[in-house]
Amino acid sequence: MYKKCHALRRIFVAGAVCAISSILLASPSQAQTSKWPDKPVRIVVPFAPGGSNDVIARRLADSLRQSLGQPFLIENKPGAGSVVGANYVAQAAKDGYTILFVSGSLATTAGVQKTPYDAKLAFEPIATVAESPFVLLLRENLGVKNLKELIAYVKANPGKVNYGTAGIGDNAQLMTELLAKEVGGLKMQSIAYKGISPAQLDLVAGRIDFLFTTMASIKGTAADALPKIAFTGATRDPGFPNVPTVKEQTGLDYVVTIWWGAFGPAGMDKKARDILNAEIKKIVQTPAFETFLETLGARPMISTPDQLGVLLATDVDRWTATAEAIGIRQK
């Protein structure tokens, strides 16, 4: 009887040791994922401090720190129109501790430049955070009151009307040329500046005729007083209910917004991704975060990872086709 009990006890102990060993020898990714995050998370912003990407990322990072109990640290890695920072994340570990926070410039850059990564495949979409329509501003005394009149004016003066951009291949150029193509082929001159601020200054001075920009860019500047004749969202901007959309004025399915979202490297740990998606959805729908976004002329935008992936791919294709059509895409 004693021998039988002793044998059973040895079997039980051996089994317990094996079970404990299995837990201890679990892969690092399994151990990390079970309690993600258990250390600080880096949020890479591929632009210099102070811009909308940086400002929104910092507010989001603070909210994530409060909800998940770990620091979310901002690292600014500017260069090549978001390529430097984006490429850094594309090559990062897939454990969920390196995240890219970026605007739709991820798509416009991929549409114009030859990037070291395939934007549609190199990243794991996590969640959208916010979006903002663009606004079409005119110089004073141009003599038109709405988009239809502007289109007619450009057609009557082929090659003589000019518009401003923040640089070759930026949002403003691509969306202006897309609109020109969709309304039947308008001939205009594109004037590229080093940033949107000098373009807006020249619009105020009357040196250029119009430009697409964001409310965040003109807030507190003289450009905010210029005529606003159209917004590019799917619906009218709540702050300017009397200004119709491009879609309303043309009948075209023309909707272009700047959006902000979070991505990881392709193949990122799915549990970490899903935790982030759920937390970001909660954060952006709080009244405090919504009020914060309003100060930037933006509004909350929630999505599933798959929806963000479709949004990115659609924009990459649209801007690639536009850049090729006007001959500015790098070979």
Per-segment meaning from a language model:
Residues 91-97, 111-198, 246-248, 259-292:
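Hinge/capping helix and adjacent helix->loop/strand transition within the periplasmic-binding protein
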